[in-house]
Amino acid sequence: TRKALDIGIENAVVGNKVFDISNSIQEYVESEGFSIVRELVGHGIGRQLHITPQIPNFSNPATMDLNVELKEGMCLAIEPMVNMGSRHIKTDSDGWTIRTQDGNASAHFEHSILITKFQPRILT
């Protein structure tokens, strides 16, 4: 999962699109034989914690935010969630705890980054 995060960050450069982040994460994770949680995604960061664009960890053509061009000054949370088995998750009765449906292990790494003229800057 950490390597998937690093690959996503490498693709978070001026002129690329959200698609470039999402697709690079998905290609790496699936090539390693793992699956990607689809219900939870990264996001923009601004005056509120969760703003557009959404930063999915997969390249679903139906996600319009994939076409958003990355511009200098944007802050993004990139946060791949990778499962050893099925990609499906469930929320416990406490309304907060999330588990894989099949009981296999899952991992999540996250960084907040700033898109700069030269390379992404990790803020966390």
Predicted regions and their residues:
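Active-site neighborhoods and metal-handling regions in enzymes and metal-associated proteins
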Residues: T1-T124
